[in-house]
Amino acid sequence: MAGHSKWANIQHRKGRQDAKRGKVFTKLIKEITVAARMGGGDPNFNPRLRLAVDKAKAENMPSENIDRAIKRGTGELDGVSYEEARYEGYGIGGAAVMVDCLTDNKTRTVADVRHAFSKNGGNMGTDGCVAFQFKHCGQLMFAPGTSEDALMEAALEAGAEDVVTNDDGSIEVITAPYEYSNVKDALEKASFRAEFGEVTMKPQNETELSGGDAERMQKLLDALESLDDVQEVYTSAVMDE
């Protein structure tokens, strides 16, 4: 990705997430509840729940909030029942966009997502229109200057699928979704702490945007991320600083 800094884009995305901390607890509670409902209440045997609980702890969510969310998911406590929904579409320059939601009213959610697309220069598409452009995987990002050879050896030994060194010197470790936590833990034991990590939908090809197009694309992403029912927004767009 000549002319673009993968590290800068990751940091920019993380900054956007940090700026929206007011919504973080709500989204995490939803994810914990759904993960527990689908896979059981023990994080040791439910990788999705373990990841959600780890995220919640990283955000300093009180343990009693986490426990209540798990119990709502397992049915031990009453609570709202959320459904998963995914919407796909196109942003500026044809950039692929995928929106993952947890909702108690799909009619409301699809209307809100469609409105955000159309109001901000995007176009909501049909199911499957862009999903094939993304790979479901774990991603751990290490800062430029990290020892490439040592990290690669430790990552592959821990079960990572791939290790990629970017043009800006940052290093990405790619894992299977269900191996993300195991690889992350193994690397931390080997003294490699990622600056950023998540289970994500990684674009297979990137759409480079700059200037006004990048600004318009950012506005679309912000509009989608601000919706109450939206959990994650993935895009193939890579924007200049």
UniProtKB/Swiss-Prot annotation:
Record family assignment: Belongs to the TACO1 family.
PANTHER family noted in UniProt: TRANSCRIPTIONAL REGULATORY PROTEIN YEBC-RELATED (PTHR12532:SF6), TRANSLATIONAL ACTIVATOR OF CYTOCHROME C OXIDASE 1 (PTHR12532)
A GO BP annotation: regulation of DNA-templated transcription
Listed name of the protein: Probable transcriptional regulatory protein AZOSEA20720
Superkingdom per UniProt: Bacteria
Pfam families documented for this protein: TACO1_YebC_N (PF20772), Transcrip_reg (PF01709)
Source organism: Aromatoleum aromaticum (strain DSM 19018 / LMG 30748 / EbN1)
Major location (coarse): cytoplasm
One cellular component term from this protein's GO annotations in UniProt: cytosol
Annotated segments matching region Disordered: 1-21
Keywords, comma-separated and alphabetical: Cytoplasm, DNA-binding, Transcription, Transcription regulation
Keyword Electron transport set for record: no
